[in-house]
Amino acid sequence: MTEPLPDVTFPQGFRAAAMAAGIKPSGKPDLSCVVSERDCAWAFAGTRSTTAAACVTRNRELYASGAPLRALVVNAGVANAATGQQGARDNADMADALASVLAVGEAEVITASTGVIGHLLPMDKVLSGVEHLPEELEGAALPFATAIMTTDTRSKLAHVTLSNGARIVGTAKGSGMIHPDMATMFAFAFTDAQVDQGALRGAFPAIVARTFNAVTVDGDTSTNDMTAVLANGAAGETDLTEFLTALEGVMRDLARQIAADGEGATRLLTVRVTGAASEAEALGAARTCCVSPLLKSAVHGADPNWGRVIMAVGRSGAGVKVEAMKVSVQGVPVFAGGPLNYDAAAVSQSMKTDEVIFDVDLGVGSARGEAWGCDLSAEYVSINADYTT
């Protein structure tokens, strides 16, 4: 996955469009779509927040129907969450507008909105923009990846080619309000692989748990979190095991990109847990470490304060044998049932890099899990103190 971002194109049968419709005050691109020339099998996961946005609610209803998809339309700048029945109508109208232009059914179009909560969509701008979006359809992926951003500092793309030539291209957005429970976080994958929808949907929750649900920036779960994969089958039959492994790799790549681009972040925080009683406990312990303000602050200051790892693991709910527990910082053992002698200054120096890794062995089993976060800087507070003002 080393191809320069500008050169990434969508898999065969998919095209995308992006434009500045005037939703964002900045005038940057804020309305986009991805369209398939063929029906798509799809899998979806949305936020478990009880204040889920209109787009999540509608997508969930469409997902339950089992019907195929043809398109996705996204607006950035307004979340259209906590907007009542008017917000629900506006969301449906956005889908219907694109469906009409594409001559497909409204139920074949899913929607996504991201931005400020509690604001209605400027529907005159949205509908006017959607009407012209298909005129801009192209194969390049970067314009779409850029148009879905809000506080992100960079676009996020990942891609892979399978042995039969089928491709998976994934794109995501997210920088703050990141603590998914399926923070504003979107992740979409598009593939020309032919995969059975039932098998895809059956495997998807576990993949999401190990990737996007293992990311945290600030502990706040968004009203609009969602991830979806669309498969149009244009490349023909594909080995399911190979496909699912590749899909998880793309989603893992995107998850790490989201964590690294956390609001105000200067370092990616990776916590790798082993020796857990179950994968769920391993993931829970790793994620609790990544969301700890104390550990995040230590990472920002390059402080190898491993006691904050012990604290976070202890409150995670994971089973632990302290006498068998081990902790390493940047590969240096610092705890093994008790404190170890180590060169704190050298470890601190090693933490002054793009990624800081903590390895934690819980000492109770053989399960493992990994989570990603970022450091906590003064810039995070500045960004969010001034977000709407």
From Swiss-Prot:
It catalyses: N(2)-acetyl-L-ornithine + L-glutamate = N-acetyl-L-glutamate + L-ornithine; L-glutamate + acetyl-CoA = N-acetyl-L-glutamate + CoA + H(+). GO terms for molecular function: glutamate N-acetyltransferase activity; L-glutamate N-acetyltransferase activity. The keyword Transmembrane does not apply. Keywords: Acyltransferase, Amino-acid biosynthesis, Arginine biosynthesis, Autocatalytic cleavage, Cytoplasm, Multifunctional enzyme, Transferase. Its EC number is 2.3.1.35, 2.3.1.1. The active site is at T184 (nucleophile). It comes from the Bacteria. Pathway: Amino-acid biosynthesis; L-arginine biosynthesis; L-ornithine and N-acetyl-L-glutamate from L-glutamate and N(2)-acetyl-L-ornithine (cyclic): step 1/1; Amino-acid biosynthesis; L-arginine biosynthesis; N(2)-acetyl-L-ornithine from L-glutamate: step 1/4. Its main location: cytoplasm. Substrate binds at T150, K173, T184, E263, N384, T389. It is found in: Cytoplasm. One of its GO terms (cellular component) is cytoplasm. GO terms for biological process: L-arginine biosynthetic process; ornithine biosynthetic process. Belongs to the ArgJ family. Catalyzes two activities which are involved in the cyclic version of arginine biosynthesis: the synthesis of N-acetylglutamate from glutamate and acetyl-CoA as the acetyl donor, and of ornithine by transacetylation between N(2)-acetylornithine and glutamate. Heterotetramer of two alpha and two beta chains. HAMAP family: ArgJ (MF_01106). This is Arginine biosynthesis bifunctional protein ArgJ. It comes from Deinococcus radiodurans (strain ATCC 13939 / DSM 20539 / JCM 16871 / CCUG 27074 / LMG 4051 / NBRC 15346 / NCIMB 9279 / VKM B-1422 / R1).
